[in-house]
Amino acid sequence: SSAASDVYKRQHYQDPFKPLIGGIKFADFNDLESVKAQITDKTCAIIMETVQGEGGIYPATKEFLQGVRDLCDEYDILLILDEIQCGMGRTGKLFAWQDYGVQPDVMTCAKALGCGVPVGAFVLNKKTAEHSLVPGDHGTTYGGNPLACAAVNAVFDCYEKQHIVEHVAQTAPYLEQKLDELVEKYDCLAARRGKGFMQGLVVTGRPVGEVINRAIENGLLVISAGSDVLRMVPPLVITKDDIDEMIEKLEKALQ
């Protein structure tokens, strides 16, 4: 938990748990030179989200993520991708990194992995597992819990039978189109960012909290990401009719 707080650059969450572990450096997202400048002979891993969530819905560019992968290979550094929010089909791929032509050494996954059952996974590729961990190195009281693992199996069965990932890939362009139309129509919207069913609208000229409250009053649940982004992470089974209803309610909040 302390290490997780260390790599999450929010004073609000870090202050109650200081002193932290330390040894963490931060680079600018989608700026490869910024990442390279932080690398030393003591760098062991680069940790990042494939699509930033709390930071404001920023997808990594292909050039950036591929460049980070190349740096990790060049300097023998682990690439750890956080797919807790952007994974499990949300971007139209089972895992967001699959759209980038790279593969992480380590991946974290949770949230939708259990569809309500609390479970997380720390996934290593074969090379990393063979050279870093042996049984007993990382003990856990609840690791491999039968109930949680049964839930994960059921989730994957559901994904396969209902073609969840394919549905997201087919339906997301419609959502993106409708959101782009809102950006064109309303001056208070500066841009749309995101991938698949993980979308954000940049709100300008008015508090994003005001838009959120008005949306809730109209029966639409949305949340912020960063200080000025309206975040939308709808259910993966949402239909075009649902999207139309969502856009209608969102327009009422923007007017």
Language model: regions and residue ranges:
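Conserved N-terminal phosphate-binding loop of PLP-dependent enzymes in the Aspartate aminotransferase
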Residues: 2-255
